[in-house]
């Protein structure tokens, strides 16, 4: 029993403005929709159900019914979901605008209550005030919201969400913004609305209001790779595939600085209808390059590493070793379809092997060495502390020699041409015979930064940008990269 969905269904019939604003996919005829994947609350109709991916941001936040309208909370078009979405910092004035919008769209007065009661009492059995028949009148005005942190912005999607105790498999978390407003003023608003209801319904209204306005906020969740769908990718088998984003826009572009003012547009119904009549869609192809996806890929690589290779004498590169149970890697994993990761893995392992051979560590690929446990961490460049510790443990394992207070290790074993070029590029055009700790870190990080320079990467994919940001980046041709041409970040 989704209260917000029911309220939109019944209040949609009040006037022309409501019929436009409160139109939900969940209340319309069902159309074929994508398969659902996660359990959570649909941001569009606020019901707890199975969710599918959004075509505007790739996050799972829309039910299979509402997905037919392709609405995203990051849209420019001021539909109901967008008007309920606020960005930090939320002021008391912003909340006043939200409450005014609620009062305009979902009014409760004596005349309206009698109208709804008369429409329900069609048969003798409906003389009782059963909650399921009057659910649309039992939606209190609260400051309950779902929140998510994207890049440097915190978004709050206000609404009336039932079943807060249910399992939440999405990155959105419940937050109570009552502290940003006056508690007594909000109580007064709801008591006034409640006074027009029959006594039996007043009790249920009060119970719902206090349960949704006095709860404790939950801690924010961290985004993970699984929170984003692969369905927006042009080619799911290509690691450098672009993601197709669809955004709903209007002819009068609204500045992001005025983000929280969208809910005030319905004050002038004629102007709002005119704005909505100018709506259209914009399509963008954006790169999937970001720290979140990169961290996920390197996490898989670190679990597939065969550290025994650093003591081997194989002539082939690390990924091309065959018929050796200690060094042969399973290269059938999808992650190895990414040529960048193949290059990084081969180069890092080749360089480490050169260090081992140069410093007299005579071993064989079948030997068991204590340094092996640190090799996988050398690919976790996004986890700075863990990566630094791994490089330091590797360097100390090589038994460096102290020269004038600085420790050095040798580098006089043959490396492949690609590694040689990277070393020269980062060591003033030379291949040094000795390296200190900083040199070793510089070379190892350069091998990864050559393709994945995480120092200058976004935390989340560009699908989480606002429509104005996408429009600006598109004008600068900064939505895509050149990886399909095998050009690295450095090139």
Curated annotation (Swiss-Prot):
Residues 320-491 are annotated as: Interaction with host IRF3. Its main location: host cell. GO terms for cellular component: host cell cytoplasm; host cytoskeleton. The keyword Metal-binding applies. It holds the Pfam family Rota_NS53. Interacts (via C-terminus) with host IRF3; this interaction leads to IRF3 degradation. Interacts with host IRF7; this interaction leads to IRF7 degradation. Interacts with host CUL1 and CUL3. Belongs to the rotavirus NSP1 family. HAMAP family: ROTA_NSP1. This is Non-structural protein 1.
């Amino acid at each position: 029993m989704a209260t917000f969905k029911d309220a939109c269904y019944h209040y949609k019939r009040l006037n022309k403005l409501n019929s436009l604003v409160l139109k939900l996919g969940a209340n319309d005829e069902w159309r074929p929709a994508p398969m659902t994947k996660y359990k959570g609350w649909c941001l569009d109709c606020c019901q707890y159900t199975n969710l599918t991916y959004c075509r505007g941001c790739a996050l799972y936040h829309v039910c299979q019914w509402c997905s037919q309208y392709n609405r995203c909370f990051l849209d420019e078009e001021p539909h109901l979901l967008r008007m309920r979405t606020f960005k930090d910092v939320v002021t008391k004035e912003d909340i006043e605008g939200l409450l005014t919008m609620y009062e305009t769209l979902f009014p409760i007065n004596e005349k309206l209550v009698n109208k709804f009661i008369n429409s329900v009492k069609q048969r003798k059995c409906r003389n009782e005030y059963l909650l399921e028949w009057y659910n649309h009148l039992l939606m209190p005005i609260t400051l309950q919201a779902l929140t998510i942190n994207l890049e440097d912005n915190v978004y709050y999607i206000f609404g009336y969400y039932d079943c807060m105790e249910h399992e939440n498999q999405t990155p959105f978390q419940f937050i109570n913004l009552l502290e940003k407003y006056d508690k007594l003023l909000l109580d007064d608003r709801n008591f006034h609305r409640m006074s027009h209801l029959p006594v039996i319904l007043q009790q249920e209204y009060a119970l719902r209001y206090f349960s949704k306005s006095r709860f404790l906020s939950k801690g924010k969740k961290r985004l993970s790779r699984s929170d984003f769908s692969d369905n927006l990718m042009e080619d799911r088998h290509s690691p450098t595939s672009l993601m197709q984003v669809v955004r709903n826009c209007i002819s009068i572009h609204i500045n992001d600085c005025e983000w929280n003012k969208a809910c005030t547009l319905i004050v002038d119904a004629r102007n709002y209808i005119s704005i909505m009549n100018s709506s259209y869609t914009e399509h963008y192809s954006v790169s999937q390059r970001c720290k979140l996806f990169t961290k996920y890929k390197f996490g898989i690589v670190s679990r597939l590493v065969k550290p025994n290779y650093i003591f081997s004498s194989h002539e082939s590169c690390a990924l091309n070793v065959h018929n050796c149970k200690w060094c042969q890697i399973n290269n059938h994993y999808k992650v190895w379809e990414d040529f960048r990761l193949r290059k990084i893995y081969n180069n890092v392992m080749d360089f480490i092997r050169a260090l081992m051979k140069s410093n007299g560590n005579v071993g064989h690929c079948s030997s068991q060495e204590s340094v092996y446990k640190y090799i996988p961490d050398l690919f976790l460049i996004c986890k700075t502390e863990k990566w630094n510790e791994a490089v330091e443990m590797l360097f100390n394992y090589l038994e460096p020699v102290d020269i004038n207070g600085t420790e050095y290790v040798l580098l006089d074993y043959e490396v492949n041409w690609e590694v040689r070029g990277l070393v020269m590029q980062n060591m003033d055009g030379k291949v040094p015979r000795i390296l200190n700790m900083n040199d070793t870190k510089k070379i190892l990080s350069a091998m990864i930064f050559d393709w994945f320079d995480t120092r200058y990467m976004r935390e989340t994919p560009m699908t989480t940008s606002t429509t104005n940001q996408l429009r600006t980046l598109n004008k600068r041709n900064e939505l895509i990269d050149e990886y399909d041409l095998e050009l690295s970040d450095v090139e």
